[in-house]
């Protein structure tokens, strides 16, 4: 969890403007570096009393790549290295679970040779919280915090995209927009 996770939804028939649901996990940005990384935290389960709440999403894992060179050739479109957190499932008439946080990716590569026809996407995004999708629903799940991508030797300069984004919180009470 590079950044904090999002808070859960307002809850059943709550008109308060602020969240009254579960709190998101703490961000670990001050503690993450090439020699200290963390798995993404799992999301909390939704509150339920009607047996239709959903579980929280799994957190992203840890990927460590050590290589002299990474090369792509040909027309592959895109290759992906992913430690994304899992989205939470949508809930019925109970609370939706929170999403998993993105994990950590450490890449120690001396040389990059990435073809424009075979780009690389490196991502450690938080998952999206579940939606409470009935009018009497309790509350949406919080979004997962962003993960971390660390290039500890040479960072790629072309044809590589790096993503570390927070996940979105789920909608409350079937609201639109959230």
Give the location of each predicted region.
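Glycine-centric low-complexity/flexibility signal
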Residues: 1-106, 121-150, 166-178
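Acidic glycine-/aspartate-rich tracts in secreted/extracellular proteins
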Residues: 69-71, 111-114, 154-158
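Acidic, glycine/polar-enriched metal-coordinating patches/loops
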Residues: 161-163
């Amino acid at each position: 969890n590079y950044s904090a996770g999002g808070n859960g939804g307002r809850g059943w028939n709550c008109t308060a403007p602020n969240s009254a649901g579960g709190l998101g996990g703490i961000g670990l940005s001050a503690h993450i570096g090439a020699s200290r990384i963390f798995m993404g935290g799992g999301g909390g389960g939704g509150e339920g009393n009607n047996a239709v709440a959903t579980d929280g999403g799994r957190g992203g894992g840890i990927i460590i790549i050590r290589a002299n060179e990474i090369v792509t050739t040909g027309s592959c479109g895109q290759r992906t290295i992913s430690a994304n957190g899992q989205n939470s499932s949508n809930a019925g008439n109970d609370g939706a679970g929170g999403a998993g946080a993105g994990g950590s990716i450490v890449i120690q590569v001396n040389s990059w040779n990435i073809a424009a026809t075979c780009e690389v996407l490196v991502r450690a995004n938080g998952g999206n919280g579940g939606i409470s999708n009935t009018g009497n629903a309790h509350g949406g799940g919080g979004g997962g915090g962003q993960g971390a991508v660390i290039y500890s030797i040479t960072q790629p300069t072309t044809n590589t995209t790096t993503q570390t984004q927070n996940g979105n919180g789920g909608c409350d009470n079937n609201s639109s927009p959230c």
